[in-house]
Amino acid sequence: MEEFDSEDFSTSEEDEDYVPSGGEYSEDDINELVKEDEVDGEEETQKTKGTKRKAESVLARKRKQGGLSLEEEGEEDANEESGGSSSEEEDAATGQEKGIESEDARKKKEDELWASFLNDVGPKSKVPPSTHVKTGEETEETSSSHLVKAEKLEKPQETEKVKITKVFDFAGEEVRVIKEVDATSKEAKSFFKQNEKEKPQSNISSSVPSLSAGSGLKRSSGMSSLLGKIGAKKQKMSTLEKSKLDWESFKEEEGIGEELAIHNRGKEGYIERKAFLDRVDHRQFEIERDLRLSQMKP
């Protein structure tokens, strides 16, 4: 039994490793094997070609997508740059337009304010006489109304005017300035007080008796120095004040004061216009300040 088992085992291994010789194949078997090998080779080549084509197409697509993406990114960057520059230009243009509009609006407002001021200050237009024939009753009514208005619009008593004379010293010359002021003004009161102080001094100097020759020399020198001090108390006048005084006297002599005032109130009068606009700005600031303070209070 042991021998039989060993033989069977050896024969089974031989069967597995057994390869028939070429003479044992028939022609049909050989042809079928060759065909199968060719078919397998063709399938493998087709598969390799297909995989290569797929890989090449994928790479081409990736390259195309990469190129497109790069081109798109470049276009987007260019669009962003152009958009940024155009937006900056638009912002600058809008800023300039707003500045011009605000300047024009400010000038227009100033012109309107100045025109309204001139209309209020300017001479009133005379009412043309009416051609309507008045009856007796109408004339009585109008006369009575005029009387009532005249009683209501009685002018207050005009204050008295006083002419005062001031003496100035300009470059060693005595300049006298005559001014007409109200009697109740501070300037007039100070002028009267100064005159009252100077009168007793002049009386004292005139009532001094003549003294002897020996003692008169010393006393005369003392009195002359005192009188010199009194006379030397002259207010000095500067060149600007002298030129202003000359200009005022020239306007009075020529009678052009009213004409100059009307001209200065016109559109060409820069000083009057500037002063008026400054007053308007100051008043507007005060109104805004009062509003802010009223809102801040609880």
Curated annotation (Swiss-Prot):
In residue numbers, the region (Disordered) covers 1-158, 191-223
Question: Has UniProt tagged this entry with the keyword Phosphoprotein?
Answer: yes
Which InterPro entries would you find in this protein's record?
BCNT-C (IPR011421), Swc5/CFDP1/2 (IPR027124)
At which residues is N6-methyllysine found? Answer: 218
Can the keyword Cell membrane be found in this entry's annotation? Answer: no
* Highest rank taxon of the organism: Eukaryota
* Keywords for this protein: Centromere, Chromosome, Developmental protein, Isopeptide bond, Kinetochore, Methylation, Phosphoprotein, Ubl conjugation
Localization, UniProt: Chromosome, Centromere, Kinetochore
- Chain segments carrying region Hydrophilic: 177-216
Instruction: Provide the BCNT-C domain boundaries.
Output: 217-298
Q: State where composition is biased (Basic and acidic residues).
A: 98-112, 148-158, 191-200
Which of the residues bear the PTM Phosphoserine? 82, 85-86, 116, 215, 249
Here the segments flagged for biased composition (Acidic residues) are: 1-18, 25-43, 70-80
| One cellular-component annotation, GO | kinetochore
Give the sites of the cross-link named Glycyl lysine isopeptide (Lys-Gly) (interchain with G-Cter in SUMO2): 149
Give residue spans, biased composition: Low complexity.
205-217
Pfam families from the UniProt entry: BCNT (PF07572)
This chain's function reads: May play a role during embryogenesis.
Name of this chain's protein: Craniofacial development protein 1
Instruction: Supply the source organism for this entry.
Output: Muntiacus reevesi (Reeves' muntjac)
UniProt gene name: CFDP1
